[in-house]
Design a protein with these regions (language model features):
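Catalytic nucleophile-loop/oxyanion-hole region of alpha/beta-hydrolase
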Residues: 105, 131-165
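An N-terminal hydrophobic leader/cap segment in hydrolases
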Residues: 8-74
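Catalytic histidine-centered segment of alpha/beta-hydrolase-like enzymes
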Residues: 288-302
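The serine-hydrolase catalytic nucleophile loop
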Residues: 101-115
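Short beta-strand/loop motif that positions the catalytic acidic residue
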Residues: 249-250, 255-258, 262
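Conserved alpha/beta-hydrolase "acid-adjacent" motif
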Residues: 263-269
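Hydrolase active-site cap/lid region
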Residues: 183-238
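Conserved alpha/beta-hydrolase
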Residues: 116-135
């Protein structure tokens, strides 16, 4: 009987230890305190971009000085989500933009916004769940955020009319959010295209890359803890997302923009997305780190975006 008590105590202790470690993994990876991020966000620590810092700050200040309207929706799981709506022209197409992991829309779209404004687009910059002024404390790497994206699309159609044309734009995690949205069979025909900047094709693959190559933790251990942390404390699962994008065809045309020097989401991580649509194209920016292709070659970036809009906005 004593041996049974001892073994039960050991097993119970191991379970408590496992849950404790899983909770800490959740807190570090998936939890967000939902506080305001830095004013300008974090500028990439890349010496080759030192000459672009002034341009970056100037673009951020321009966007901060633009007039906007706070708009809100309620997510499918009852979170209040906020966005910044920038109005340029009545009856103009609308760009719906999603930022990166722990990013800010001001930082991530300070350059892209200027291109869209020049094209006469109205722009909605979304604060994703658990970021900035949107509610929630769990970042799900695009799993739940993709459902939020569909809610934002429906908001725009309900507010501006059934003939409203919508362009989806996403950077990094936002790129995956957009990609995971356009494979939805029920996506409205209002969405005429999508631009994916340095996206990953699978939450599992990007977490595995970070775990193995950056933290040097074997995946059998890291993957087990991440899945447990997400499921037990974040109330979501990303396992089924692994093959979803490559097994479904996107109804919406899209392009991928990616830097070949990306150390956060390696350039090849977006290759599988091209399998979702035979007409999709990928533009590789030489020497560009994560999320800074616009700063590396502004004119080429503008050309890629404008050519895509010209081809798909009817």
């Amino acid at each position: 009987m004593l041996a049974l008590y001892i073994s039960s105590g050991i097993i119970g202790g191991l379970i408590i230890l496992y849950l404790f470690i899983s909770f800490n993994v959740y807190w570090v990876i998936f939890h967000s305190p939902n506080k305001q991020q830095k004013k300008y966000g974090d500028f990439p620590n890349d010496p080759s971009l030192s000459q672009s810092y002034d341009l970056y700050i100037d673009l951020v200040k321009k966007l901060q000085n633009e007039k906007y309207e706070n708009v809100y929706i309620t997510s499918y799981d009852k979170l209040k989500l906020r966005g910044r709506y920038y109005h340029s022209n009545d009856n103009a197409p609308i760009a719906l933009c999603f930022h990166g992991f722990r990013g800010t829309p001001i930082r991530d779209f300070c350059g892209g916004y200027q291109i869209l404004k020049e094209r006469g687009f109205n722009v909605l910059l979304v604060d994703e769940r658990a970021h900035i002024n949107s509610k929630g404390h769990t970042i799900t790497f695009g799993v739940k955020e993709s459902k939020d994206a569909t809610s934002w699309i429906n908001y725009l159609i309900n507010r501006f009319g059934k003939d409203t044309k919508i362009l989806l734009v996403g950077i990094s995690m936002g790129g995956y959010i957009v990609a995971n949205t356009i494979i939805n069979e029920d996506i409205p025909n209002n969405v005429f295209g999508a631009i994916l900047d340095c996206p990953y094709h699978s939450p599992i693959e990007i977490l595995k890359h970070s775990c193995v190559n950056k933290l040097h933790i074997p995946w059998w251990l890291g993957g087990t803890l991440l899945r447990s942390a997400a499921f037990i404390f974040g109330h979501f699962s990303f396992y089924k997302e692994k093959y979803q994008l490559t097994n479904k065809l996107a109804k919406v045309n899209f392009i991928v923009i990616h830097g070949d020097n990306d150390s956060i989401v390696p350039c090849q991580f977006s290759d599988n997305l091209l399998l979702a649509n035979k007409e999709a194209r990928k533009y590789v920016f030489k020497g560009a780190e994560h999320g800074v292709s616009y700063l590396v070659d502004k004119e080429l970036y503008k050309k890629c975006v404008n050519d895509f809009i010209n081809e798909n906005l009817k």
